[in-house]
Each structure stands twice: as C-alpha cells, then as structure tokens.
C-alpha cells in the first residue's frame, strides 16, 4: 500500500465523495450521479485532487441544467473529468435498480478503474 486514498460514492455518496475531495485531503475522488451537487458548487474551488464525475443523460434527479452548471464550474477549477452516459437514468450502475444499464455501468466502471490507477 502506498498510503494514498480515494473516495468513491453513488448518489448521496457521490455528493459525499465530492465534499471529501473539497475538504478532506483525499488523493482522488469518483462521484457517480451526485444528487443536488449543483447546490454545493461553492465547494468546488477547494478541490485539490483529481475528481471524476459520472452523470446519466436521462437522470430524473439531476437535470441537464445541473450537469451544465457542474461542467462550467469544474472547467474553472480544472481538477475534474466529467463523463455523461446517453440514454440512461439515475442509478444506471446499480444492478438492483430498474435503471441498471450493463453497458453504461461497465464503461463507467472501466473509466473509474483507469482514473484511479492513473491518480493513486
């Protein structure tokens, strides 16, 4: 173990992962469809680690305006990668939910593993 730490979270956990990136000194963060994140963009300038966001294009909980606000703010901050998955809904990575999408989940999982390997 090299002592480096990442946070990974889904939905509310995605928001918590984002807040850890901004406030805790983790070395990397992955945030899957973080609900209501647009209400917490004041924390973005505090992010000091690489952060990866996964958003569902058809998300009923995080609309396209919220994703656009995150994209705009993170472009200013410069610490984030943002991936959007077309045709899928909130929870696309959870096999126990009706919104589960195996292709999008596999793609997001692979991207997360590469991101973590590159940043830890």
What are these language model-derived features?
Residues 1-120:
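N-terminal cap/leader regions of alpha/beta-hydrolase-fold enzymes
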